[in-house]
Design a protein with these regions (language model features):
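PLP-dependent amino-acid enzyme catalytic core
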Residues: 1-182
């Protein structure tokens, strides 16, 4: 697994805990991604995208399967590269559930791509570092465009307030990307 320098220590530790060797390269997701592609090609490894891979999307879709018995009318899903949103939408759309994506203002590459603007963005700094994606995946872009009912843009101040309220009122320390849908 390749992660950029500066990746949160808890994420590195979490990946290593499950037996993966973590290599750090570059200062951004994109630099780490390019290095991972290069390693895969040079060593005949299978490259596995963090979000733009059918197996990853299917795995993340199991969250939608877990939600389905609770018969929600609407599910809001954080979007970075689109794997989670694609998987959850695939699992829930046949149940008649509205699926809405959520992105942070200035980190809204999927919302832009769905509207036809596929240019890379310079993602803003955000507490939701797990969704800082310059360009969403090709597969996930097609799935999100077809399956999502809407994408809402959340202001950083709203995200910050949500994280504080979760900590103070619920005694819950949440990752920024996870709290984005709240």
């Amino acid at each position: 697994t390749v992660m950029p320098h500066g990746a949160p220590e808890n994420k590195i530790a979490g990946v290593a805990h499950w037996g993966a060797t973590v290599r750090q390269h570059g200062d951004s997701y994109d630099e780490a991604y390019a290095f991972a592609r290069q390693l895969a090609e040079q060593n005949d490894y299978r490259f596995l995208s963090a979000f733009d891979d059918p197996d990853v999307i299917a795995g993340q879709g199991t969250i939608g399967i877990e939600i389905a018995p609770h018969t929600p009318d609407v599910v809001i899903v954080p979007i970075g590269g689109g794997g989670l949103a694609s998987g959850v939408a695939l699992a829930l759309k046949s149940q008649g559930v509205r699926v809405v994506g959520a992105q942070v203002e200035g980190v809204d590459s999927m919302a832009r791509a769905i509207k036809g603007d596929t240019a890379a963005i310079d993602p803003a700094r955000t507490l939701a570092d797990g969704v800082r994606v310059k360009v969403p995946g090709l597969l996930t872009r097609r799935l999100c465009a077809r399956l999502l009912d809407d994408v809402v843009i959340v202001h950083e101040a709203e995200l910050r307030e949500t994280l504080v309220r979760l900590a103070l009122e619920e005694n819950l320390i949440a990752e920024g990307a996870g709290a984005l849908a709240l």
